[in-house]
């Protein structure tokens, strides 16, 4: 129920003070109505940061828009600036039956993502030096899925049904 200082991202100066509860309610209302903003508890992220990032003296300061990627940025233990880079892709579950029995499929997709990272490292202009350095050090890639609802519709499986939960 205390006051919350709204600070300038440029100089940290307090621009306005408002009731913290009011701010929290506005955030939650916007989240319910629009799906945004995404909320990241950065202190928790940094407490759980992988050991090799801790040893490099790195911290996560931000994430991508949807908050599924939290990679460290800043100056590492070798004195080099890092700009986080991650190559993401999604498998479309609408086409799951076409690739589900191929034991090599996911490995091939991951190799493709790594090849995209190599291509970025080789082709990025000098202005992207910090991103190239980070890409070379981390080679961060991510693979997710999309189209679950479409797949269930194809198979006449009601969303939320027992069948959808055991699939």
Residue spans for each PLM region:
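Glycine-rich phosphate/pyrophosphate-binding loops
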Residues: 158-161
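Function-dense linear segments that define catalytic or interfacial modules
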Residues: 31-135, 140, 145-155
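Glycine-rich and small/hydrophobic secondary-structure elements
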Residues: 165-167
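Polar, glycine-rich mid-to-C-terminal structural blocks
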Residues: 1-34, 42
